[in-house]
From Swiss-Prot:
GO terms for cellular component: cytoplasm. Its EC number is 6.1.1.19. HAMAP family: Arg_tRNA_synth. This is Arginine--tRNA ligase. It comes from Streptococcus pneumoniae serotype 4 (strain ATCC BAA-334 / TIGR4). The keyword Manganese does not apply. It is found in: Cytoplasm. GO terms for biological process: arginyl-tRNA aminoacylation. A motif ('HIGH' region) lies at residues 121-131. The keyword Transcription regulation does not apply. It is an enzyme of class 6 (ligase).
Length: 563
């Protein structure tokens, strides 16, 4: 039970009109620590009690009598709780030094499955910064859900089917060079893709030719299939090299093509349930009763199935294969209407588990305020960006610690961590402007800043040769250490909030606050000096390091021991 839960429990025993859950939601953290650690506003009770909030607050403060609090006082309409710093710091430090990286582990998920649809780059196109968001958000959510007791299944739903393959085949047959493609597959295929899109704007016959080649591909034409397979294989080699560098793994690479033979079954179910309507030669599902104006287009007039038909097949396959408790789609917010339709059609089909599907949208990455586009060749490629971030990190590490032994390894962890952290600290639904210099800075709210705080603590612990005792009696009651204790105590709740909101930025912002609080503590406190508090200060440093490292791990970011 954390402090807020304890206060809510105590208050619920003397307030008849509010239950513990309602009280918990009303509790606030005062801006000024002189007003206590936690405050309960009495306004909501005024109407029921028919008394002024100030009077209610005074009565509640009078009735509170718990040894967990240093004091409880009424200040105007608020009941302010001052916590017993020594007792709580002892509990928190005991918990972290005993449980170590398992501190804040929970079993909310009871080992049920969470399927995470993430990354999903398009075959034969380079892996750009645009794909990074889905990849790192999905990977972080996987760590977060595992932390609270779920098993996760990470699915890379590759864009390995569609008219763009008709475009690529036409471009390759017209202008492609087999040796050049073998040497630099993605670069060459991107050039071909950009060129045919540019030329098709002036020559509509290229579009028709591409459609024809895609029809051949759908019908199993040998040449079309061989080229498609080659484009796919070459792309996957490149993608996997990047995933290895990012330290992101997947449980399934079943992409769009995997569902080619599973869509007719979906159309049959819709037909049997009488859900398909004819509209201008096409077959659709009406979704007006769900407040969705446009019907879901299942089959075009030429018999071709659509994106939503494929996603329906994927949803049915995943439910059958994984029996998921949650199915999460980490896909850009421009797809919001599509996922509303997907859930509504599944509901119409009678599948209650459609409620377990969640679209986790995210904002765009821009460069100097401009939208990025592969088609127009205006794109930030991930591989050279990672190399540049690692190079910049190495320059700063050499300046700070020229004697460091494994500079390359540390620069790699810092450079890649910087890119991931910058993305994840941004509220998911907001976009951000790509700025490598800001990302790799050791100052400000960045990954390197948090990593450096962790490495600094490790240096302190090495100097002290500190090993925490499981039965150690550690406690502190000064203001600076109290700020850190409150944050560490809050870590389990922070993880729950991040999971409930599918929002890794909650953990990134927590990591920044904890690093800042420790740096402030370090500036004011002589941790290594001989004093009665020395062991407790070292235990606090140790606990901070444990929680910082775990917060970074939940974001998919490494924590180097030395920097």
């Amino acid at each position: 039970m954390n402090t807020k839960e304890l206060i809510a429990s105590e208050l619920s025993s003397i307030i008849d009109s509010l239950d513990q859950e309602a009280i918990l939601k009303l509790l606030e953290t005062p801006k000024n620590s002189e007003m206590g650690d936690i405050a309960f506003p009495a306004f909501s009770l005024a109407k029921v009690e028919r008394k002024a909030p100030q009077m209610i607050a005074a009565e509640l403060a009078e009735k509170m009598n718990s040894q967990a609090f240093e004091k409880v006082v009424a200040t105007g309409p608020y009941v302010n709780f001052f916590l017993d710093k020594s007792a709580i710091s002892a509990q928190v430090l005991q918990a972290v030094t005993t449980e170590k990286e398992h501190y804040a582990d929970q079993n909310i998920g009871k080992q049920e499955n969470v399927v995470i649809d993430m990354s999903s780059p398009n075959i034969a196109k380079p892996f750009s910064i645009g794909h990074l968001r889905s990849t790192v958000i999905g990977d972080s959510l996987s760590h977060i859900f595992q932390k609270i007791g779920y098993q996760t299944v990470k699915v890379n739903h590759l864009g390995d089917w569609g008219k763009q393959f008709g475009m690529l085949i036409v471009a390759y047959k017209k202008w492609g060079d087999e040796e050049a493609v073998k040497a630099h597959p993605i670069d060459e295929l991107l050039k071909l893709y950009v060129r045919i899109n540019a030329e098709a704007e002036n020559d509509p016959s290229l579009d028709e030719e591409a459609r024809e080649w895609f029809r051949k591909l759908e019908n199993g034409d040998e040449e079309a299939l061989a080229l498609w397979q080659w484009f796919r294989d070459e792309s996957l080699v490149e993608f996997n090299r990047l995933y290895n560098e990012l330290k992101v793994e997947f449980d399934s690479y079943n992409g769009e093509a995997f569902y080619n033979d599973k869509m007719d079954a979906v159309v049959d179910i819709l037909s049997e349930k009488g859900l398909l309507l004819e509209s201008e030669g096409a077959q659709v599902v009406n979704l007006e009763k769900y407040g969705i104006e446009h019907p879901a287009l299942i089959k075009k007039s030429d018999g071709a199935t659509l994106y939503i038909t494929r996603d329906l097949a994927a949803a049915l396959y995943r439910k059958n294969e994984y029996q998921f408790a949650k199915s999460i789609y980490v896909v850009g917010q421009e797809q919001s209407a599509h996922f509303k339709q997907l859930k509504a059609v599944l509901q119409e089909m009678g599948y209650d588990w459609s409620d377990d599907i969640t679209h986790v949208p995210f904002g765009l990455v821009t460069k100097e305020g401009k939208k990025l586009s592969t088609r127009k060749g205006n794109v930030i490629l991930l591989e050279p960006t990672v190399a540049e971030a690692v190079s910049r990190a190495k320059v700063q590490i050499e300046a700070k610690n020229p004697e460091l032994e494994n500079k390359d390894q540390v620069a790699h962890a810092v450079g890649i961590g910087a890119i991931k952290f910058y993305d994840l600290k941004t509220d998911r639904t907001n976009g951000y402007d790509f700025d490598l210099e800001a990302m790799v800075s050791f100052e400000g709210e960045t990954g390197p800043y948090v990593q450096y705080a962790y490495a600094r603590i490790q240096s302190i612990l090495r100097k002290a040769d500190f090993k925490p005792e499981t039965a150690g009696n550690y406690s502190l009651n000064d203001t600076e250490s109290w700020e850190i204790i409150k944050l560490i105590q809050d870590f389990p709740r922070i993880i729950n909030r991040a999971a409930d909101n599918f929002e890794p930025s909650i953990i990134a912002k927590f990591a920044i606050s904890l690093a800042q609080s420790f740096n402030k503590y370090y500036a004011h406190t002589r941790i290594l000096d001989e004093s009665p508090e020395r062991d407790s200060r070292l235990a606090l440093s140790y606990a901070t390091a444990v929680v910082l490292k775990e917060a970074l791990r939940l974001l998919g970011v490494e924590a180097p021991e030395k920097m």
